[in-house]
């Protein structure tokens, strides 16, 4: 996978999972890859099967120079808005790295406020290995967390849709109302609450 941007020093790739769902946290990951220990098969997490993502997540944890995963809670999403909560989760992930990054590449078109140079790369999770690695860690950690929430709130089917807006999720919202882990600032949830 080509590194399209000329990075500075130790580069961390940053990506998130969970901006679009109606429930659960938004999760971000930051990864500094080891050029001496390349990882074959890195790609945008959405283009990989669950089995492949899980296998790659293990390899990333073993081979990366450093990695960290952080989240912004449903309460933070509702208080700040999803964009600001996503930036907060990204900042937390970078701050949690065991090795200090010297620059950052982030998937998308906005960078979080960091104390290192940062460049946003549109569709970076399909272009830059460290962002792809962050995409995979963020997605696998968020999915695991949604399975925990499914055990607490089984009526909503989080194990199937991970909180994303699906017909089944809308039907569950209509039947059961919003759970404590639903994002009240999101239109479909707010509309459901207004009907109660």
UniProtKB/Swiss-Prot annotation:
GO cellular component, one term: ribonuclease H2 complex
GO process terms (BP): DNA replication, removal of RNA primer; mismatch repair
The reaction(s) this protein catalyses: Endonucleolytic cleavage to 5'-phosphomonoester
Residues given in the record as a divalent metal cation binding sites: 15-16, 107
Gene3D superfamilies per record: Ribonuclease H-like superfamily/Ribonuclease H
Protein family: Belongs to the RNase HII family.
UniProt-recorded name of the protein: Ribonuclease HII
Organism name: Dechloromonas aromatica (strain RCB)
Lineage start: Bacteria, Pseudomonadati, Pseudomonadota, Betaproteobacteria, Rhodocyclales
